[in-house]
Design a protein with these regions (language model features):
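Beta1-alpha1 glycine-rich phosphate/pyrophosphate-binding loop at the start
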Residues: 5-71, 75
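Feature captures the FAD/FMN-dependent oxidoreductase FAD-binding
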Residues: 64-119
Length: 119
């Protein structure tokens, strides 16, 4: 399967989700973004951090890691930013490629098989 996107974010942890949301705030259309996450859900390591202390700066309240990740996940879903879970990036190449894209990403998952992603 070939996919073309303006922005591809490798990793759906808090930084990846924040990058996607920031791109939308800067005018990038959500459908021009793709988040690739190897785990079963967005949130990264925060899903394992059950202690409080997250979110004071961003959400103005103290949250556990899973709560913080869930807030970001809901924002990503509300903006309809596409993402692929259980997706492992196998290769990333730079340089002008197909149709003038700068990056070629090879990834795979059980649902789609081999993915050729151009960004």
């Amino acid at each position: 399967m070939n996919i073309r996107k303006e922005i591809v974010i490798i990793g759906g942890g808090p930084a990846g989700m924040a990058a996607a949301l920031g791109a939308v705030e800067q005018g990038v259309e959500p459908q021009d973004i793709l988040i690739l996450e190897r785990d079963a859900q967005l949130g990264g390591i925060l899903n394992q951090c059950i202690h409080n202390g997250f979110g004071l700066h961003t959400f103005k309240e103290e949250l556990t890691g899973p709560e913080y990740a869930s807030r970001y996940r809901r924002q990503v879903e509300a903006k309809q930013i596409p993402y692929k879970l259980h997706t492992m990036v196998m290769s990333l190449r730079s340089g002008r490629g197909e149709d003038g894209y700068d990056k070629e990403i090879i990834a795979m998952n059980k649902e789609d098989g081999m993915l050729m992603i151009y960004a």
